[in-house]
């Protein structure tokens, strides 16, 4: 159920999309969710012989916290504070204010936002008709409603639901925010990279329905992030390891890659790197890939069962020692996959892998948790790292030219096709919608 105030200045009231039978305690709901998830995961673990069941307590805890709006309010305020303290993001990202005095575990009251959903590409990119030095309704001093006009009044029935605030689209309603998809997507990747590598507080449900885009009076885009129920916290040691992992993957530093994943109990660095990058990793020993290369289609069909067994083994190798495996990686992977899908949906306007890797390397220089001597060493490595990333730019611009000439898709389409092909060779069909909210 979702209810909204219909007057500017009064916030929206939301109790989310959870079905809560009248009189049923919230603890019962959490118990039911946990029991159902345990049962399904146990069946999967037994049928496919993959150690999923040990992950149930952590996943169930995260999902149950989504039903607690006080937890969501805490996450929302913490994220707003972190963004306000980061000069590279504070003018590009906005977190709606929460009214604590009007909120509880079952209901959260938050600031009303007028914006365009991420999936409405036309509304984001069409020309702006809202006036000079004006922004989206309610954005940084822009009035929520235009000055009163003497024309025909609004439909009174519609006004009871919510006032129309489409004056910025122009008389024929064909205008838009006049923004660049590249600027929008850059802000998104910057935001979630900072969450992973700088702050260790990661929003794990960044699908298009949870992201609004507004136009500031300056003409620049502003990303509004909502729905802060599903977060994970990364301790400083794990956060530094994860940043080093990304640097190692992008520079083919297989020694560092192997060292890090070994401490996590992972037995197959290549497959793990591919799953993290969302593209086949070409820098390791390629043992898994070589086992599949050189086979004809008929040979692959004959070996279908063996390849499925190899796929199961690869997953077991990724999970490795369940006592060492960082369970946060489940939801970090979800975030990465959804952000990749968002970039793909918008036509791959940015080199997501390069931006993410740059934040990882930069975090090892800027993190307050690291000693000064290590920061200085990482600074020199960061300069070298930026040079190495030039090859990633070459591939990105190759795909952009190909896309412009209508000879193929964008960078994310190529990555998606490579991953689909790699998985198919292993007897697995990837469901591209599995992480998209």
Protein language model annotation of sequence segments:
Residues 87, 200, 346-350:
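Long, hydrophobic, amphipathic alpha-helical segments used as structural scaffolds
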Residues 57-59, 104, 113-115, 120-187, ...:
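Helix-rich C-lobe and terminal helical cap/extension of kinase-like folds
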Residues 200, 205-207:
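Conserved catalytic-loop position in the HRD/HxD motif
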Residues 183-199:
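Conserved helicase/translocase P-loop NTPase motor core
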Residues 1-166:
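Conserved ATP-binding subdomain of kinase catalytic cores across diverse folds
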Residues 209-213:
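Hydrophobic residue at the +6 position relative to the catalytic HRD Asp in the kinase catalytic loop
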Residues 22-26, 62, 66, 199, ...:
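Short, charged/polar micro-motifs that form catalytic or ligand-binding hotspots
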Residues 72, 109, 207, 227, ...:
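Residue-level signature of catalytic and energy-coupling elements of molecular machines
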């Amino acid at each position: 159920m979702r209810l909204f105030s219909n007057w500017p200045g009064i916030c929206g009231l939301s109790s989310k999309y959870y079905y809560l039978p009248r009189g049923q305690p919230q603890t019962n709901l959490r118990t039911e969710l946990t029991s159902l998830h345990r049962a399904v995961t146990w069946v999967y673990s037994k049928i496919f012989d993959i150690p999923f069941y040990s992950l149930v307590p952590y996943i169930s805890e995260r999902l149950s916290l989504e039903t607690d709006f006080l937890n969501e309010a805490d996450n929302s305020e913490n994220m707003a504070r972190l963004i306000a303290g980061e000069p590279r993001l504070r003018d590009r990202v906005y977190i709606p204010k929460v009214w604590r005095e009007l909120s509880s575990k079952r209901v959260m009251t938050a600031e009303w936002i007028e914006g365009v959903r991420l999936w409405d590409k036309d509304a984001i990119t069409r020309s702006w008709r809202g006036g000079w030095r004006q922004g989206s309704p309610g954005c940084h001093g822009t009035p929520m409603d235009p000055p009163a006009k003497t024309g025909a009044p609004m439909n009174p029935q519609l006004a009871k639901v919510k006032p129309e605030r489409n004056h910025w689209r122009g008389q024929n309603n064909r205008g838009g925010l006049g923004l660049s998809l590249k600027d929008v997507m850059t802000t998104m990747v910057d935001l979630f990279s900072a969450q992973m590598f700088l702050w260790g507080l990661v929003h794990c449900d960044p699908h298009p329905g949870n992201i609004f885009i507004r136009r500031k009076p300056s003409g620049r885009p502003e990303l509004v992030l909502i729905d802060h129920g599903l977060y994970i916290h990364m301790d400083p040691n794990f956060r530094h390891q994860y940043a080093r992992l990304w640097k190692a993957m992008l520079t083919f530093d297989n020694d560092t890659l192997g060292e890090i994943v070994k401490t996590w109990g992972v037995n197959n660095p290549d497959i793990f790197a591919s799953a993290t990058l969302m593209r086949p990793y070409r820098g390791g020993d390629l043992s898994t890939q070589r086992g599949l290369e050189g086979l004809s289609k008929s040979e692959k069909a004959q070996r279908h069962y063996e390849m499925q067994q190899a796929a199961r083994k690869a997953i077991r190798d990724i999970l490795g020692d369940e006592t060492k495996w960082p369970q946060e990686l489940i939801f970090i992977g979800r975030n990465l996959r959804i952000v990749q899908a968002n970039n793909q949906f918008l036509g791959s306007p940015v080199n997501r892998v390069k931006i993410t890797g740059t934040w990882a390397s930069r975090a090892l220089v800027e993190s307050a948790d690291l000693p000064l001597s290590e920061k200085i060493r990482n600074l020199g490595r960061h300069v070298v790292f930026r040079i190495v990333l030039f090859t990633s730019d070459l591939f990105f611009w190759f795909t952009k030219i190909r896309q412009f000439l209508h000879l193929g898709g964008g960078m994310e389409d190529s990555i998606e096709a490579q991953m689909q092909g790699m998985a198919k060779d292993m007897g697995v069909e990837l469901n591209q919608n599995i992480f998209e909210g």
